[in-house]
Structures are given as structure tokens and as C-alpha cells.
Amino acid sequence: MNPLISSASVIAAGLAVGLASIGPGVGQGTAAGQAVEGIARQPEAEGKIRGTLLLSLAFMEALTIYGLVVALALLFANPFV
């Protein structure tokens, strides 16, 4: 295996996980903050807000998992070899 391709795959895998987690991390923080603010304003809507928050957090976390899958594919099933 070419060492240049091998090292580029490791760097790309690290970037895939790192960059794939930036957006969802910011989005999850914003969503959680807005949910807490909404619950503080309307405590009677806490159940509905919490359910919507958990669903949206799961969708955001899926983006990070996709980045992890790409990184694992680059490390263990390298298509460039």
C-alpha cells in the first residue's frame, strides 16, 4: 500500500469525524437552549417541547454518525487501495 494514500486516509478520517460533529454540536446546543427557554416560558407545554427536542436531537446526531461511518470506511475498507 502506498504510504501517501494511507496517511491521507487517516487524516481524512480524522477530518470527517471532526467536521461532521461541529454542525450538529452547535445545533444541539442551540436547540437545547431554546427548549429550556420555551419550557421556562410555558411550563405546561413541557412534554410536547421535550418530545420534539429529543426527536430533533436524534436527527442531528445521525449526521455525526454518518461522519463516523465515512471515517471507518476510509480506515478499514479503503476504496483508494
From Swiss-Prot:
The family database entries (SUPFAM superfamilies) matched by this protein are listed as: F1F0 ATP synthase subunit C
Transmembrane parts of this sequence: 3-23, 57-77
GO CC entries: chloroplast thylakoid membrane; proton-transporting ATP synthase complex; proton-transporting two-sector ATPase complex, proton-transporting domain
Q: Which domain of life is it from?
A: Eukaryota
Has keyword Translocase? no
- Membrane association type: Multi-pass membrane protein
Compartments, as annotated in UniProt: Plastid, Chloroplast thylakoid membrane
- A GO MF label: proton-transporting ATP synthase activity, rotational mechanism
Alphabetically list the UniProt keywords: ATP synthesis, CF(0), Chloroplast, Hydrogen ion transport, Ion transport, Lipid-binding, Membrane, Plastid, Thylakoid, Transmembrane, Transmembrane helix, Transport
Task: Spell out the residues of the site Reversibly protonated during proton transport.
Answer: 61
> Do you know which InterPro entries this protein is assigned to?
ATP_synth_csu_bac/chlpt, ATP_synth_F0_csu, ATP_synth_F0_csu_DDCD_BS, ATP_synth_F0_csu_sf, ATPase_proteolipid_c-like_dom, F/V-ATP_Csub_sf
Keyword Membrane on entry: yes
* Location (main, coarse): plastid
Q: Which HAMAP family match?
A: ATP_synth_c_bact (MF_01396)
Oligomer and partners = F-type ATPases have 2 components, F(1) - the catalytic core - and F(0) - the membrane proton channel. F(1) has five subunits: alpha(3), beta(3), gamma(1), delta(1), epsilon(1). F(0) has four main subunits: a(1), b(1), b'(1) and c(10-14). The alpha and beta chains form an alternating ring which encloses part of the gamma chain. F(1) is attached to F(0) by a central stalk formed by the gamma and epsilon chains, while a peripheral stalk is formed by the delta, b and b' chains.
NCBIfam families attached here? ATP_synt_c (TIGR01260), PRK07354.1 (NF005608)
What does the function comment of this entry state? F(1)F(0) ATP synthase produces ATP from ADP in the presence of a proton or sodium gradient. F-type ATPases consist of two structural domains, F(1) containing the extramembraneous catalytic core and F(0) containing the membrane proton channel, linked together by a central stalk and a peripheral stalk. During catalysis, ATP synthesis in the catalytic domain of F(1) is coupled via a rotary mechanism of the central stalk subunits to proton translocation. Key component of the F(0) channel; it plays a direct role in translocation across the membrane. A homomeric c-ring of between 10-14 subunits forms the central stalk rotor element with the F(1) delta and epsilon subunits.
As a miscellaneous remark, the entry gives:
In plastids the F-type ATPase is also known as CF(1)CF(0).
| Family of this protein | Belongs to the ATPase C chain family.
Designated name of the protein: ATP synthase subunit c, chloroplastic
The scientific name of the source species is: Ceratophyllum demersum (Rigid hornwort)
